[in-house]
């Protein structure tokens, strides 16, 4: 699906408290140190318009379909305005969350929602999928303890262990469904640097 770009598209996925944002940043800093053309972005967000949509999505309680469509609209703006242009210039794009997060966070709230998310992406979005996705696999019990230490939170952070388990199981399911693309990094008992080194081995 990536025949319209020259660069490489890397995404990081995982539940709240998994450390995926930290690993996204660490990989970005590493590639920059190697003089590799690279940008770091995130979803929901990444552009002025999408960041405004993010504020609604992560703080307001929306109807499930409204939340899904909000996420998809933000992604379209992000892809067209930012991701695809820099990929065409040969950059590596690192994105903290992408389509798989939408499947798990929004898709699970709808009947046949996971398949719906991927079908909507295929139908509505430009023909682009990640070249590689890193699923940072951290057990929910560990993840929720990390989140409880944060000073800031959104509506997803403060949901209980049942929600964390559901999201975790969803990412595990997706890693089994798309094994060629999604690389699972078992990170519960590893340091940040150890996780980073494992990620580098897949590049």
Swiss-Prot record:
Amino acids binding ATP: 14-21
User: Which reactions appear under catalytic activity for this entry?
Assistant: dTMP + ATP = dTDP + ADP
* Gene3D superfamilies assigned to the protein according to its UniProt record, in alphabetical order: P-loop containing nucleotide triphosphate hydrolases
EC number, as in UniProt: 2.7.4.9
Name the enzyme's class.
Answer: transferase
Task: Please tell me one Gene Ontology term that the record gives under cellular component.
Answer: cytosol
- Keyword field: ATP-binding, Kinase, Nucleotide biosynthesis, Nucleotide-binding, Transferase
Q: What does it do?
A: Phosphorylation of dTMP to form dTDP in both de novo and salvage pathways of dTTP synthesis.
Q: Which PANTHER family match?
A: THYMIDYLATE KINASE (PTHR10344), UMP-CMP KINASE 2, MITOCHONDRIAL (PTHR10344:SF4)
What is the name listed in the Swiss-Prot or TrEMBL entry for this protein?
Answer: Thymidylate kinase
Native organism is Rickettsia canadensis (strain McKiel)
Record lineage: Bacteria, Pseudomonadati, Pseudomonadota, Alphaproteobacteria, Rickettsiales
